[in-house]
Each structure stands twice: as C-alpha cells, then as structure tokens.
Regions:
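NAD(P)H-binding glycine-rich loop region in Rossmannoid oxidoreductase-like domains
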Residues: 38, 44, 48-88, 96, ...
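N-terminal Rossmann NAD(P)H-binding glycine-rich loop of SDR-like oxidoreductase domains
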Residues: 6-26
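Conserved catalytic-site region of short-chain dehydrogenase/reductase
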Residues: 76, 112-121, 150-155
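Amphipathic terminal alpha-helices
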Residues: 5, 274-304
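Mid/C-terminal beta-alpha module of Rossmann-like enzyme folds, strongest
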Residues: 198-262, 294-304
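Substrate-positioning beta->alpha
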Residues: 156-160, 174-197, 203-207, 217
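Conserved beta-loop-beta element that borders a ligand/cofactor-binding pocket
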Residues: 131-153
Length: 304
C-alpha cells in the first residue's frame, strides 16, 4: 500500500466500522486490527491479532502517519477485566507506536465516563488509559476524545432504548434532574477526520457531544420522541433499589457463569450520575472545521 496510512483498532465495532467507511470514502488508506482473518483490498490491509499481540501491533503501526485507537472493553466483572484491555492493551499500542522512527500522531477514543473515574471499573480504566497516553505526549503527538453516549444505526447500547421509547415508554435510572449529552456516530467520525486532516497535530483531552446547550433530560428526550413518532411517551423512573439489586445479582451470576455483564453496580452509578453534559468549545477551537450537525430530533427516526 502506498500513500499516507492510518492505523485503526476496533474497526469491526460500531464506531470503528463507521470510521473505516468514512476513511475509505475520503481517500485514506487504512491498516486495521482484526481478531479473525479478513481479505485485504487496494485500500485496506487487515492485521490479524489483538491488543495483547505485540508483533501484530508493530505490524499495524509500521509506517503509518496516525493511529486511531477505537478498541475497548465495555463489559466486565472486575476491575482487572477492564484494565487488561483498556489500559494494558492501550499501553501495548502506545509502546509499538513510539518505537517507530517517526512516531505517528495518536488518538485515543475514550469516554466521558473517564471524567468521573470513581463511578465504575470501566470509568477507572478509561481514565488510566487516558493518563497513559498523555504521559507519552512528549514523544508523539497525543489526543484524547471523550465522547458522551454515542448512537446511530447499528449501535447496541442506545438503539434498544430508542426501540422501547417508540412503544411509548422511556425507562430511566436516577432522577429527573439528571442531564446528559448525546452524540451521533457520524459527528464523532467527522471529528476524527478533522483531527487527521490538521497540519499541526492537536494535543489534549476533549469532550464531545452534539452541542445542545445544557444537554438533554428525560423530559426533553420524551418530548422529542413524541414529536418524531406522533405518540405519547411516558418517562418511567425505575426504583433505584431494584436496579441495584438486579445489577448485583447480574455481577455475581457473571462471575459464577463466566460471562461479561453490562449491567453492574458501577454501570448503575454511571446511569444515576447527575451531569454528563459536555463543553465542546475547546474542541471546536482546536478543530475549527468541526461542528456537530446531527441532533436527536434529526436522527431519532433512523436511530433504531
């Protein structure tokens, strides 16, 4: 493959797959990490391996101009589960990158959860991964994106909620005063493309949502859903004690039966947190060509 290359992890996941399509459409050549064999083409080279495979990671980043690290673990039954993938895996990728004669610019797709690392094992691991990346910014240009909840066609986290909402029920955990940001996957990918295209590498940690002032709350989401789907939508706040009980049972069942749970006590604390609204001003200053363009009202009918 000739021409500028970008290395991508997580290219088979929700965000990574949308990014891959956009990169190819934009004329980039991509080298991507994959766990299972895939067929190369003129513009995409697949490197078989994972974040534990140091040789695969060296092959992934060899000669690339940029690394976009989308891969990460969102389910787990212990802090160690998350640290292994999100921290140690990131460390392996950083190590492979800084060993290059000309280290590439490096972008970590983290999570807004890292802003509150005390809430969950996931949030802790994301914050640790961020710090690891930033600690190497004197060797290679490093950037961290902290997107809020990302949704869009194909996502497995928000789409089920939207499907239930279409039936007239918006289930929530926490309090009516909670506020949160949302981000369409296309706007996140657009920010990544802008980051790649800057002549001078961008440094720092940046939050991303759709830019709605003050974010959303349960009532505003319900109102938008009513407008889009032309039916009444009722907000139902699930009892906190019941949700916590289910989360604890799920965690212990996961440890007993050896599966990776999504609903854990830490996830419940994330869901109950009062403020997940972003300030995107720093990123719009760093990337003047980026502005979020898709609000929930625009995307809800296609989000499921």
């Amino acid at each position: 493959m000739s021409g500028p290359l970008v290395a991508v992890t997580g290219a088979t996941g929700f965000i990574g797959s949308v990014l891959l399509k956009s990169l190819l459409k934009g004329g980039w050549k991509v080298r991507a990490l994959t766990r299972s064999p895939r067929v190369d083409d003129e513009f995409t080279q697949w490197i078989e391996g994972d974040l534990d495979n140091l040789n695969a990671l060296r092959n992934l980043v060899k000669g690339v101009s940029a690394v976009v690290h989308c891969a990460g673990q969102v389910r787990g039954s212990s802090l160690e589960d998350f640290v292994h993938s999100n921290v140690e895996g990131t460390g392996n990728l950083v190590s492979a990158s800084i060993q290059q004669d000309l280290p590439p610019r490096f972008l970590l797709i983290s999570s807004l959860a890292a802003r509150q690392p005390e809430l969950s094992w996931y949030a802790t691991s994301k914050r640790m991964a961020e710090q690891l990346v930033i600690d190497h910014s004197h060797i290679m240009p490093c950037t961290v994106f902290r997107p809020t909840a990302v949704y869009g066609p194909g996502d497995k986290e928000m789409s089920p909620l939207f499907r239930v909402t279409r039936l007239g029920i918006l289930p929530m955990v926490g309090q009516p005063s909670m506020r949160f940001g949302l981000l369409h996957v296309n706007d996140l990918v657009a920010a990544i493309l802008c980051w790649l295209s800057t002549r001078i590498p961008v440094h720092g940690v940046y939050e991303l949502d759709d830019g709605k002032p003050g974010g959303y709350d349960s009532q505003s989401v319900a109102a938008i859903a009513q407008e889009v789907w032309k039916r009444r939508v009722y907000c139902i706040f699930l009892p906190a004690l019941l949700v916590s009980l289910i989360a604890n049972i799920n965690l212990w069942s996961a440890r007993l039966l050896n599966y990776s749970p999504m609903l854990t006590p830490g996830k419940v604390r994330e869901l109950q947190h009062l403020d997940w609204v972003c300030d995107i001003t720093p990123l719009t200053l760093a990337l003047p060509n980026w502005q979020p363009r898709i609000g929930l009202r625009d995307a809800l009918s296609q989000a499921i």
